[in-house]
Structure formats: structure tokens, C-alpha cells
Amino acid sequence: MIGLIGRKVGMTRVFTEEGVSIPVTVVEVEANRVAQVKTLETDGYAAIQVTAGTKKANRVNKAEAGHFAKAGVEAGRGLWEFRLENGEEFAVGSELTVELFNEVKKVDVTGTSKGKGFQGTVKRWNFRTQDMTHGNSLSHRAPGSIGQCQTPGRVFKGKKMAGHMGAERVTTQNLEIVRVDAERNLLLIKGAVPGATGGNVIVKPAVKA
């Protein structure tokens, strides 16, 4: 399914004709350039590889420079891939713009969530805190028991404990497109999307729409 690579600009709001305020996230979608077309014959699956944005020449390594030069496209800030469905065809060097979403009502947005560092169970997993008084003087935010005794004699995998929080791939589904601004290459999406301001996001037509 073809999507677009964008950059999260921030949040604002727009008003309907009735005066209702709608919170929106502004996603800047510069033209996505096709850097490679993968086919069943050569790669075993059909897909396109795209790049977006720009990258300083001194930040492009030789492998990347050769890859972009072969495609005849300007080096971008990364490479992303979209699987092709039956009948879809694209040429190397062609561009995908925000107009791809002119007829789309709902989208799925994927980004990297904000990193929170090492966090305890209360913040990371919404555990309840223990008593602030009534004889408890040390274990207010402690997780409590993490398992049994000699049987099984270990902590089960997946146990919710303190650890690194955030900085992981997150997808928010079924977000509504409020406006497509082709002139300024902007998508206005209702609500919040994952990640920090300036982060890369992948916008695709919603799979559950």
C-alpha cells in the first residue's frame, strides 16, 4: 500500500463553518522521490523505495551517493519502502505528492515516539502507587511482587517492570484528514500523531477505514 513520508511540524487548530474548533497536527510532505523499483523477477516482491527531503552532501556516504546517482534523484534524509499492489506501476525518478490523499478520508500514521529514558512502573505501565502512609515509609512507587517463589524460580518473560520508555515505532490508526494543502505541501490530520516535532512520519491510507 502506497503512502507518503512526511515531517511533523506541530499542532494547531482549524475552525469549521459552524465555529467548531478541531485540533490538528500539521505534517509537511515534501515530494517523495522514487529511488528504486523492486519487482517480483529481480527482488521476489513488488515495491518502491522512496526518499524525501534533503541531506547535506558531506553527510552522504559513498554507498548512498552511488544509489541516488544511479536513480538520478537528489539525496534525501532517508530511504523508505512501500509494497505495491497488483497493477500499480511507478518509474524511478518520479515524484509522489500530497495530492495522493485528495480522495482519502482516514489514514494510519507511523512515527517514533518521544524517548522518556529509564522510567519506573508507575509512569511506564500506569501501575498504582502504594500507600503514602499507614506504615509504608519506603515503597510508595515500588512495583511490588514480580513473581512466585521456588516454583517457577524465575521471572516470566514480558513481566512489566521498570526500564527504557519510548523511542519506539508507534502507529496511530484511523486518523481523519481535515485538509490537504497541495500548494504548501501540507496535510492537516485531526488529533495527535506519534513522535516529536521535526520527526519523520509515514502516512498511509487506513487499513481499517
Swiss-Prot record:
<dbReference type="Pfam" id="PF00297">
    <property type="entry name" value="Ribosomal_L3"/>
</dbReference>
<comment type="similarity">
    <text>Belongs to the universal ribosomal protein uL3 family.</text>
</comment>
<dbReference type="InterPro" id="IPR000597">
    <property type="entry name" value="Ribosomal_uL3"/>
</dbReference>
<comment type="function">
    <text>One of the primary rRNA binding proteins, it binds directly near the 3'-end of the 23S rRNA, where it nucleates assembly of the 50S subunit.</text>
</comment>
<keyword id="KW-0699">rRNA-binding</keyword>
<feature type="modified residue" description="N5-methylglutamine">
    <location>
        <position position="150"/>
    </location>
</feature>
<keyword id="KW-0689">Ribosomal protein</keyword>
<protein>
    <recommendedName>
        <fullName>Large ribosomal subunit protein uL3</fullName>
    </recommendedName>
</protein>
<dbReference type="InterPro" id="IPR019926">
    <property type="entry name" value="Ribosomal_uL3_CS"/>
</dbReference>
<keyword id="KW-0694">RNA-binding</keyword>
<keyword id="KW-0488">Methylation</keyword>
<dbReference type="InterPro" id="IPR019927">
    <property type="entry name" value="Ribosomal_uL3_bac/org-type"/>
</dbReference>
<keyword id="KW-0687">Ribonucleoprotein</keyword>
<dbReference type="GO" id="GO:0019843">
    <property type="term" value="F:rRNA binding"/>
</dbReference>
<comment type="subunit">
    <text>Part of the 50S ribosomal subunit. Forms a cluster with proteins L14 and L19.</text>
</comment>
<dbReference type="GO" id="GO:0022625">
    <property type="term" value="C:cytosolic large ribosomal subunit"/>
</dbReference>
<dbReference type="GO" id="GO:0003735">
    <property type="term" value="F:structural constituent of ribosome"/>
</dbReference>
<dbReference type="GO" id="GO:0006412">
    <property type="term" value="P:translation"/>
</dbReference>
<dbReference type="InterPro" id="IPR009000">
    <property type="entry name" value="Transl_B-barrel_sf"/>
</dbReference>
